[in-house]
Swiss-Prot record:
Cysteines paired by S-S bonds: none
Gene: glgB
Coiled coil: none
Entries under PANTHER family matching the protein: 1,4-ALPHA-GLUCAN-BRANCHING ENZYME
Name assigned to this protein: 1,4-alpha-glucan branching enzyme GlgB
Known EC number: 2.4.1.18
Enzyme class per UniProt: transferase
Species: Synechococcus sp. (strain RCC307)
Alphabetized Gene3D superfamilies for the sequence: Glycosidases, Golgi alpha-mannosidase II, Immunoglobulins
Entry keyword annotation includes Cell wall biogenesis/degradation: no
Keyword Phosphoprotein part of the UniProt annotation: no
Keywords: Carbohydrate metabolism, Glycogen biosynthesis, Glycogen metabolism, Glycosyltransferase, Transferase
Length: 772
């Protein structure tokens, strides 16, 4: 094989050796010379010998121009169908040449849509994809880093040396490289050399899997191959309006719900133990459960409690456990703490098989400064604003996305679609929406910049949220999009076509604060704070509200729900039961945080797990029973959920009895004409003959009583129900004479089929005697 006579440009060799080349395919791989001949140039750092294998022939390559550039002449273009036998440090291996594969991965339309901010499936192009090119298996890498001087793929395959696999720059700041021979499971990062001469090692922003913390590399993972079993669930979900369904959510943090033992590792399907992931230093010997173990334990538990959905605190990859998941570095990857991408999919799949929806906390408002993450990604403020007055949350130590940049919005909007399309989640809760909407959020005067109109509103963030919700509901009309928005920003749950942000639910932070403030009061002072109980109804229909008692209310010295309550243990438990029952009967969808369903005593601690030992005590088990029955009642009575968001669904009977701290109201279902009566006594004083007005004559069945013995109460009540009396009250022609136990909420329903004599005989039987 004759040596090529091409005068090699030494500057290209030096640029390659210094990781400073942005178009390696211009000089590497098959190259046609001016006279029509072909030369193959191979970049092989630290190799001592390279032999080209093609069509049954071996061609020893030489390196006359640089020690690491091997070249040889061929009579025709070999394309990508040649292999290289490489000797390095006494070891010989064969491989394909990455620079022989020249097919552009990102097409012109992909680049156009991405630059426009409208490529809703950009993850199918960006990132690392196991792929077959020209019949050769490998991994296609694609990265956006428009301000980088050069980018290399580094990993186990290069001994983490950026000189081996420089990437090819394309139009629009896209960098690509197909690496033959790699596959799923390969660890990698991008080595980015900046215009200023600095070098950063970055995880893949679009990586689908990452190493377990504290390691930081991305892991090649295929999105293909998992066989979903939830087609019927998804079809049903997207054919109905979730606002017209019961929604009862169990919010949980996977890493602190329950731990396993270090001495009892998870056993893989092939019988080998999986390396345990330590839970925390504060609990020696504890390990995190895996996705399969969590599926085995969480799903039956949540189903038994009767919840319709699980809300998972952020599951995207994050380096620090103490952030609870809210400081994300891997937006496109379920955290590897608990297992693999497909194991997370299987968790969701099993939830759907058991009739449980999955809501994910999504964090598009900020990201951490970790060196391997998005911060200063390509030597420029690529994902964040450069000015800290609009680009940084100093109190949180995080950076704010630059929503005015199309590609950044595209990254986030497509990420939302990704979690629904590839991982089949059913809803999102967007964290800290207020921090996105206001430029002066947690900022003193002088440390924020007004918008172009002189206001404090972040108009770019508004447009981003509107775009995200519009795209979400375009693809997934039955999805839930929930805003944690703590201010009075208008139209949060109005459609974007009407000027709203486009969410379909908003956490009712006002209700939560009013309720907790009220229930923390000494019982006898509650009469002076009746407005805390009643005020939420006056604005209940201004947004589509979700009532939430979340993780934020049981940390940082706030104490858990039980210990917010006044009085003895007996009174505390009665208060918890009353609060939860009032919550389930109040307009709005429901969310409670893990541990509240059994009245955990201690604060939530991300480093530990729940106080499962408390379930051996009857008072705690009683709260579990209460939640079980509340969810069953809630789902069986459309009056409690169908008209949550219009005024027809709620009617006060009496909200003015401040002396007794008693309120009563009706919940109504317009579609079927059903209605229930709710009576609440929020003091430890019972009332033997408490009368409320009702609209219809007849028998009122006592459907629910939070003082029931099954719940740990005193079991006082109304012997299953009461007939109304022809005694007008509260603007109604009929009334009920009720027994109201202390600190109790009761639910009644009119039964048109019950006759007075039959009810009288039944009551006598319950008393063990006759009623005159």
């Amino acid at each position: 094989m004759a040596l090529a006579t091409l005068d090699w440009m030494s500057k290209d060799a030096e640029r390659l050796a210094q990781c400073n080349h942005d178009h390696p395919q211009a000089v590497l791989g098959p190259q046609q010379l001016e006279d029509g001949r072909w030369v193959v140039r191979v970049w092989m750092p630290e190799a001592s010998r390279v032999v080209l294998l093609h069509q049954g022939h071996e061609h020893a390559l030489e390196n006359p121009h640089h020690a690491w550039i091997f070249e040889g002449e061929l009579s025709s273009n070999p394309g990508s169908q040649y292999r290289l036998r490489v000797e390095r440090a006494g070891i010989t291996h064969e491989q394909h040449d990455p620079y022989a594969f020249r097919q552009e991965w990102m097409g012109a339309m992909d680049r156009h849509l991405f630059a426009e901010g409208n490529h809703h499936h950009i993850w199918q192009r960006m990132g690392a994809h196991p792929h077959l090119q020209d019949g050769v298996a490998g991994v296609q890498f694609c990265l956006w880093a428009p301000n980088a001087r050069s980018v290399s793929v580094i990993g186990d395959c290069t001994n983490w040396d950026g000189r081996h696999l420089p990437m090819q720059q394309r139009i629009g700041g896209i960098w690509e490289l197909f690496v033959p021979g790699l596959g799923a499971g390969a660890h990698y990062k991008y080595e980015i050399h900046t215009q200023q001469g600095h070098c950063y090692e970055k995880a893949d922003p679009y990586g689908f899997q990452h190493e377990v913390r504290p390691a930081q590399a991305s892991v090649v993972a295929s999105l293909k191959g998992y066989q979903w079993g939830d087609d019927a669930w998804l079809k049903q979900r997207d054919n109905r309006n979730p606002l017209e369904q019961p929604v009862s959510v169990y919010e949980m943090h996977m890493g602190s719900w329950m731990h396993g033992s270090w001495d009892e590792p998870y056993i893989e399907a092939d019988g080998t133990p999986r390396a345990p992931v330590p839970a925390a230093d504060l609990k020696p010997g504890a390990r995190l459960l895996t996705y399969p173990e969590l599926a085995d334990r969480v799903i039956p538990y949540v189903k038994a409690r009767g919840f319709t959905h699980i809300e998972l605190m952020p599951m995207a990859e994050h380096p620090f456990d103490g952030s609870w998941g809210y400081q994300v570095t891997g937006f496109y990857a379920p955290t590897s703490r608990f297992g693999t991408l497909d194991e997370f999919r299987a968790f969701v799949d099993r939830c759907h098989a058991e009739g449980i929806g999955v809501i994910l906390d999504w964090v598009p408002g900020h990201f951490p400064k970790d060196a391997h993450g998005l911060a200063f990604f390509d030597g420029s403020h690529l994902y964040e604003h450069g000015d800290p007055r609009i680009g940084e949350h100093k109190e949180w130590g995080t950076l704010i996305f630059n929503y005015s940049r199309n590609e950044v919005r595209n990254f986030l909007v497509a990420n939302l679609v990704f979690w629904f399309e590839e991982l089949h989640i059913d809803g999102i809760r967007v964290d800290a929406v207020a921090s996105m909407l206001y430029r002066d959020y947690l900022r003193p005067d002088g440390e924020w910049i007004a918008n172009e109109h002189g206001g404090r509103e972040n108009l770019e963030a508004v447009r981003f949220l509107q775009q995200a919700n519009s795209v979400l509901f375009h693809y997934f009309p039955g999805a839930l999009s929930i805003a944690e928005e703590s201010t009075t920003w208008p139209l949060v749950t109005m459609p974007t076509s009407m000027g709203g942000l486009g969410f379909n639910l908003k956490w009712n932070m006002g209700w939560m604060h009013d309720m907790l403030d009220y229930f923390e009061l000494d019982h006898w002072f509650r009469q002076f704070h009746q407005n805390n109980i009643t005020f939420s109804i006056w604005y209940a229909h201004t947004e589509n509200f979700m009532l939430a008692l979340s993780h934020d209310e049981v940390v940082h010295g706030k104490s858990h729900l039980l210990h917010k309550m006044p009085g003895s243990d007996e009174l505390k438990f009665a208060n918890v039961r009353a609060l939860l029952t009032y919550m389930w009967t109040h307009p709005g969808k429901k969310t409670i945080f893990m541990g509240m369903e059994f009245a955990q005593r201690g604060e939530w601690n991300v480093w530990g797990d729940l106080e499962w030992d408390k379930l051996q005590f009857p008072e705690h088990q009683g709260v579990v029973n209460l939640v079980d029955d509340l969810n069953a009642l809630y789902k069986s009575e459309p009056a409690l959920w169908r008209n949550d968001f219009d005024s027809f669904g709620f009617q006060w009977i009496d909200c003015d009895d401040t002396n007794h701290s008693v309120v009563s109201f009706m919940r109504r279902d317009e579609k079927e004409g059903n209605w229930v009566v709710v009576v609440c006594n929020f003091t430890p004083e019972g009332h033997g003959n408490y009368r409320i007005g009702v609209p219809v004559d007849g028998f009122y069945t006592e459907l629910f009583n939070s003082d029931g013995a099954r719940y740990g109460g005193s079991n006082q009540g109304n012997l299953g129900g009461k007939f109304s009396d022809d005694w007008g009250m509260h603007s109604y022609g009929q009334s009920l004479d009720l027994c109201l136990p202390p600190l109790t909420v009761m639910v009644f329903k009119h039964d048109p089929n019950r006759q007075r004599e039959a009810a009288k005989d039944e009551a006598a039987a319950k008393l063990g005697g006759s009623l005159g």
